[in-house]
Amino acid sequence: MVSVVMPAYNEEEIIENTVKEWYGEVVSRITGAELIVVNDCSKDMTGEVLARLAQEIPALRPLTPERNGGHGRALRYGFDHVTQDWVFQTDSDQQHIPSDFWRIWEQRETSDFVLGVRSTRADGPVRVLITTVMRMANFVVWGLWIRDANCPFKLMRRQAMEKVLVRIPRDSFIPMVILSILCRKMEYRVTEVVVQHLPRRGGEQSLGGLWKWLKVGSRCLRQLLALRVRLLWGRGNANPIGNRR
């Protein structure tokens, strides 16, 4: 009934606990559920840990793309392999609480997308600033006030998700931010649910200091602007907005 998808990169310290927590709290309690972990060509023992766990947990499906592509591409790779009617996106860094899933899950009957909103960001002022800037950029570029477009805690009806993703270039750096925008523009039923956010307990952060974050922010803004133009004119990989069927 649900495919839980999470990317992982150099998470050997915490990936076993992450998998066991999500399996015990969520996957084992839903008939037919699967846990897809995309090992984004980690340089540590993440892949080996996942391979061992897959022998113990049949619902675990570890996947490894041919090359490292970053968080966004790893998610798209995982989405390509889901088998269930609902898709849940989360991260493997243990900054979210698996039990919060049920608060999201209970909204599915009246929603196509249920999007988590972090109550507070627990990973430092730079990331809080980036979230604020992203919120303002979405308003300026798209005319939408989205509280937490990049929160990695989203439940999506698979059929609707696929119709949104086809409009997002596969090499997008921020596919889930754009998905948060397009599902509203395409007039799907969207619900927001406040969820907890914890400090990272281990593993490796994918992004570094302030200078790198500034470059990331600039790249995100360029992609938002470029996609806005592409969608407006119906060019490239993205179709014009307006018909979600």
Regions found by a protein language model. Give the residues of each.
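Acidic helix N-cap motif at the loop->helix transition within catalytic regions
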Residues: E13-N17, D44-L53
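Conserved donor nucleotide-binding strand/loop of the catalytic core
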Residues: A33-I36, G47-H81
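Cell-envelope/extracellular polymer assembly enzymes that use nucleotide-activated donors
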Residues: M1-S3, E34, I178
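A conserved acidic beta->alpha catalytic loop
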Residues: N39-E48, Q94
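Catalytic donor-sugar/metal-binding loop of nucleotide-sugar-dependent glycosyltransferases
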Residues: I168-D171, S180-L198
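Short, well-formed alpha-helical segments that are part of the catalytic scaffolds
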Residues: E11-V26
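Short active-site alpha-helical segment characteristic of glycosyltransferases
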Residues: H96, P175-L182
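Acceptor/aglycone-binding surface of glycosyltransferases and processive sugar-polymer synthases
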Residues: P65-H81, W86-F88, Q95-F173, R200-L221, ...
